[in-house]
Amino acid sequence: MTQDELKQAVAKAAVDHIAPHLEPSSIVGVGTGSTANFFIDYLAEYRNDFDGAVASSEATAERLKKHGIPVYDLNAVNEIEFYVDGADETNESLELIKGGGGALTREKIVAAVAKTFICIADESKQVGILGEFPLPVEVIPMARSHVGREIVKLGGDPVYRDGFVTDNGNIIIDIHNMDISRPLVVEEKLNNIVGVVTNGLFARRPADLLLLGTRDGVKSIARGA
């Protein structure tokens, strides 16, 4: 199977997982990226079975609307039953690196609200220790140099994502060669830097369920199992 076929398989598995639980009042949180896009396409088949969605990016909102799925502002909903999103890396504890597409802050907010966070990924994203994929950090523009210096103090190599602006109007610094053997500690240290909005480590709020696309089919891995 190609990587796209693996992504399609896990996206369909996620829809199959949540479909029996959808009610007319249900709100589904939807992530950003290529795997999330496949999820949206499959979710559209059930658009009459639930109320609507909360999107983690403008691009996701646009795709949902094209399928006729109502998109709500997060402040307008009381709860989100499921949040489904991809990842750039995942470890065995279902701690993640996300934000390759630059939507990490909104993704982290929606994940924090959701009762169940389902991560969908192909097997290339599963790693022993996080950090081979550069760790994105969303930064207030005027703090760019300061944050970069602080990242160096923590042992990382900061690289400005030139020309990229987040949906929130901020910039991204990608951290290379960072020791992330203790994801929760690193997440908190980075978030404590003045000028950082948030970083792409999902350790305080890891996934509850990982649907992993492999050559042998989709594996379902629950956190703590």
Curated annotation (Swiss-Prot):
A Gene Ontology molecular function term of the record: ribose-5-phosphate isomerase activity
EC number, UniProt record: 5.3.1.6
Record's keyword annotation contains Isomerase: yes
GO CC terms, sorted: cytosol
Record protein name field: Ribose-5-phosphate isomerase A
Pathway the protein acts in: Carbohydrate degradation; pentose phosphate pathway; D-ribose 5-phosphate from D-ribulose 5-phosphate (non-oxidative stage): step 1/1
Gene name tied to this protein: rpiA
Family (UniProt): Belongs to the ribose 5-phosphate isomerase family.
Binding site for substrate: 32-35, 85-88, 98-101, 125
Record keyword Isomerase present: yes
Catalytic activity: aldehydo-D-ribose 5-phosphate = D-ribulose 5-phosphate
GO biological process: D-ribose metabolic process; pentose-phosphate shunt, non-oxidative branch
